[in-house]
């Protein structure tokens, strides 16, 4: 039998120890106690942070949302069918980050920033945190530049400025998404980058939005973040924050961006689902107590930031430029009930709302914007000069028309002044109608508003107002292209432009019969 020399054994062990490559990882590890409905309870994670990424076997990740005395409640990001009780769970020491940058433009990604459009991987290296603190008051600048939506009813009566939060609210199927998509289409030549976040939508609806943006040449400067109805509640809850981070990339570098959240009602429902599964106490309408904070911390990130902020953020690479992120959140109401919990929350957070009404939509007034209830709290300062000058009487005319129309139903004979006011209101209502996917330029809009404001529609039949407007715009773009170009570039209103518009409309009406 061979004798083992103790000194040889110690030399072999010493050699093995020297060759051993140990990269130490101080990682806190726990055990999965239960898995149900995308919620995982973990025992033994002592040093985990709120919102920290937790790694499970097989490359599955979760996010810690409940830090309890004896366990941690985490939500799984993605499929959870491979997870089982007794598996290990490790802290990563990282918070959730998503890819950002111009490489994402023209792409469709999920809530975690993974491409889902079949166009290959993203060629970017930059990532940023999903949850970020909004810029402080010192770094903000007042809103004084417009975001043209291309809709007469919005740009004339409820103007939106760069850095504003303007809520689009209304019942289902009355054109909320159409309004937002048209606003994105109108930005294709404005230099504003767009982000469209689809939350809880049907995949066919998202595919249709992508196709429409592509057809209208707006997909190239748009990022689409899709968390469809088939995705887990966790991804629907995270999608708006991911989209906001992608939009902030442009804002922080002195660019302008527009983000649409379609819609935040579904995000609130997803968050309610997560909270109830985490056994958090329910409040009004079974929503958790922090549902207001859910939306306020998201919408406060939309802002206009100062030159100093951009310069500080870019370490002096960009100077003298302000950045902005404009938000158009969408909220779906039930039977026009704007006093429900989530609608009132978002109304109080935003800088105004565009209220779409079912009755108007069903009577053929599209976009179905109710000018009486809709308001823009800060957009007036950002409105283009010519639009501001010409749209003053439009809102008043519509409000008075609504009031008079209600009384006129009961009165058989009306005096001349009331009848004229009613007819003017009807013509303005007709003028505010607009087809989908046909946003208007500033010059086209100014021309229509000028015709209404200066009484050029008085002798036009109410049913022919739309045809008159189209023919007039076509005539001006053909015969007065210089004037239209000047309005589009400068947006000013002076005596020269006033005289040019007046002479042009008079000449147009002299050659046509309406």
Curated annotation (Swiss-Prot):
GO molecular function per UniProt: ADP binding; ATP binding; proton-transporting ATP synthase activity, rotational mechanism
Broad class of the protein's primary localization: membrane
Binding residues for ATP: 170-177
InterPro entries from the UniProt entry: ATP_synth_asu-like_sf (IPR023366), ATP_synth_asu_C (IPR000793), ATP_synth_asu_C_sf (IPR038376), ATP_synth_F1_a_nt-bd_dom (IPR033732), ATP_synth_F1_asu (IPR005294), ATPase_a/bsu_AS (IPR020003), ATPase_F1/V1/A1_a/bsu_N (IPR004100), ATPase_F1/V1/A1_a/bsu_N_sf (IPR036121)
UniProt-annotated location(s): Cell inner membrane
PROSITE patterns: ATPASE_ALPHA_BETA
Site feature (Required for activity) residues: 374
Topology relative to the membrane: Peripheral membrane protein
Record-listed E.C. numbers: 7.1.2.2
GO CC, alphabetical: plasma membrane; proton-transporting ATP synthase complex
UniProt keyword annotations, A-Z: ATP synthesis, ATP-binding, Cell inner membrane, Cell membrane, CF(1), Hydrogen ion transport, Ion transport, Membrane, Nucleotide-binding, Translocase, Transport
CDD domains tied to this protein: ATP-synt_F1_alpha_C, ATP-synt_F1_alpha_N, F1-ATPase_alpha_CD
Superkingdom of the organism of origin: Bacteria
Reaction(s) this enzyme catalyzes, per UniProt: ATP + H2O + 4 H(+)(in) = ADP + phosphate + 5 H(+)(out)
Known role: Produces ATP from ADP in the presence of a proton gradient across the membrane. The alpha chain is a regulatory subunit.
Family: Belongs to the ATPase alpha/beta chains family.
Binding partners and assembly: F-type ATPases have 2 components, CF(1) - the catalytic core - and CF(0) - the membrane proton channel. CF(1) has five subunits: alpha(3), beta(3), gamma(1), delta(1), epsilon(1). CF(0) has three main subunits: a(1), b(2) and c(9-12). The alpha and beta chains form an alternating ring which encloses part of the gamma chain. CF(1) is attached to CF(0) by a central stalk formed by the gamma and epsilon chains, while a peripheral stalk is formed by the delta and b chains.
Classification via PANTHER family: ATP SYNTHASE SUBUNIT ALPHA, MITOCHONDRIAL
Protein name: ATP synthase subunit alpha
Organism: Pseudomonas fluorescens (strain ATCC BAA-477 / NRRL B-23932 / Pf-5)
Gene assigned in the entry: atpA
């Amino acid at each position: 039998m061979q004798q083992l020399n103790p000194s040889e054994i110690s030399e072999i062990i010493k050699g093995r120890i020297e060759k051993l490559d140990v990269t130490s990882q101080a990682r806190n590890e726990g055990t999965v106690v239960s898995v149900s409905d995308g919620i995982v309870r973990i025992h033994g994670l002592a040093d985990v942070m709120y919102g920290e990424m937790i790694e499970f076997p097989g490359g599955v990740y979760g996010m810690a949302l409940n830090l309890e005395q004896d366990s941690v409640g985490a939500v799984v990001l993605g499929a959870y069918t491979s997870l089982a009780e007794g598996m290990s769970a490790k802290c990563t020491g990282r918070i959730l980050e998503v890819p950002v940058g111009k490489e994402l433009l023209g792409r469709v990604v999920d809530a975690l920033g993974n491409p889902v459009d079949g166009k290959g991987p993203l060629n970017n290296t930059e990532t940023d945190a999903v949850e970020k603190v909004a810029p402080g008051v010192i770094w903000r600048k007042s809103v004084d530049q417009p975001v043209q939506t291309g809709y007469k009813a919005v740009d004339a009566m409820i103007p939106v400025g760069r850095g504003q939060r303007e809520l689009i609210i209304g019942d289902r199927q009355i054109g909320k998404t159409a309004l937002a998509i048209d606003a994105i289409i109108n930005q294709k030549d404005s230099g504003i980058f767009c982000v469209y976040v689809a939350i809880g939508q049907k995949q066919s609806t998202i595919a249709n939005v992508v196709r429409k943006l592509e057809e209208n040449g707006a997909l190239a400067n748009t990022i689409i973040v899709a968390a469809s109805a088939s995705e887990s509640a966790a991804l629907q809850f995270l999608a708006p924050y991911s989209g906001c981070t992608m939009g902030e990339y442009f804002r922080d570098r002195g660019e302008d961006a527009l983000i649409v959240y379609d819609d935040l009602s579904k995000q609130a429902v997803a968050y309610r689902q997560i909270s109830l599964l985490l056994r958090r106490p329910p409040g009004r309408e079974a929503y958790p107590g922090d549902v207001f904070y859910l939306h306020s911390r998201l919408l406060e990130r939309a802002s206009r930031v100062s030159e100093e902020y951009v310069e500080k953020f870019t370490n002096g690479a960009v100077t003298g430029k302000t950045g902005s992120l404009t938000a158009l959140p969408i909220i779906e109401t039930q039977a026009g009930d704007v006093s429900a919990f989530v609608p009132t929350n978002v109304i109080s957070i935003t800088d105004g709302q565009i209220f779409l009404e079912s009755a108007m939509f069903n009577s053929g007034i599209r976009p179905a914007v109710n000018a009486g209830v809709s308001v823009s709290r800060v957009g007036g300062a950002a409105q283009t000069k010519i639009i501001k000058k010409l749209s003053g009487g439009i809102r008043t005319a519509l409000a008075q028309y609504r009031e008079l129309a209600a009384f006129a139903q009961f009165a058989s004979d009306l005096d001349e002044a009331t009848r004229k006011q009613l007819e003017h209101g009807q013509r303005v209502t007709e003028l505010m109608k607009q087809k989908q996917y046909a946003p208007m330029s500033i010059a086209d809009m100014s021309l229509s508003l000028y015709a209404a404001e200066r009484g050029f529609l008085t002798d036009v039949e109410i049913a022919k107002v739309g045809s008159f407007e189209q023919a007039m715009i076509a005539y001006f773009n053909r015969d007065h292209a210089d004037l239209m170009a000047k309005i589009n570039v400068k947006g000013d209103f002076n005596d020269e432009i006033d005289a040019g518009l007046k002479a042009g409309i008079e000449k147009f009406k002299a050659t046509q019969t309406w």
